[in-house]
Amino acid sequence: MAGEAASPPLKVLAAQLRAAGRGAGGTWRLSRTETGRAPLCLRAVWMQGTVLQVERGGGGSARLRDGSGHFTVLGVEDVPRGRPCLSAGKYVMVMGMVRACSPEPVLRAIKMTDLSENPVHEEMWGLEVEELHRVIP
């Protein structure tokens, strides 16, 4: 895909990503058959969830849960502002490159931010994702 502009991270829920399959050139194909639309090809995603567990060392990893399921984020100790987010119960935003989708999504972290201070972030997340996917052609 040389010469193509990189797509921004796509907001997704764990359940949506879990159903994605391998695409061409290292992309993942996010199915949208239920809406009658063509699949979306993606490499990077934006996800939000509550930190359940953190493993230190080797770049670190974290297990998170959003309203639709669980996902794992690798390299959490290597991203700017990642370490302050690394405690159970924090609600965080993660941008990352998709490494696997099944049986559970696995991301390599690019960016993490703690969103715990404002509960509106968690309350609105599912609606934000739903609205975005409704307007993407």
Swiss-Prot record:
- What does the sequence similarity comment in the record state about its family? Belongs to the RMI2 family.
Cellular compartments per GO CC = cytosol; nuclear speck; RecQ family helicase-topoisomerase III complex
Q: What's one GO MF term for it? A: DNA binding
Q: State whether keyword Nucleotide-binding applies.
A: no
Alphabetical GO biological process terms: DNA repair; DNA replication; double-strand break repair via homologous recombination; maintenance of rDNA; negative regulation of double-strand break repair via homologous recombination; regulation of sister chromatid segregation; resolution of DNA recombination intermediates
Q: Which UniProt keywords apply?
A: DNA replication, DNA-binding, Nucleus
As annotated, the DNA-binding region falls at: 45-115
Q: What does this protein do?
A: Essential component of the RMI complex, a complex that plays an important role in the processing of homologous recombination intermediates. It is required to regulate sister chromatid segregation and to limit DNA crossover. Essential for the stability, localization, and function of BLM, TOP3A, and complexes containing BLM. In the RMI complex, it is required to target BLM to chromatin and stress-induced nuclear foci and mitotic phosphorylation of BLM.
Record flagged with keyword Nucleus: yes
Q: What is this protein called?
A: RecQ-mediated genome instability protein 2
- Assembly description: Component of the RMI complex, containing at least TOP3A, RMI1 and RMI2. The RMI complex interacts with BLM.
InterPro entries reported in the protein's UniProt record: NA-bd_OB-fold, RMI2
| Annotated compartments | Nucleus
A Pfam family matched in the record = RMI2
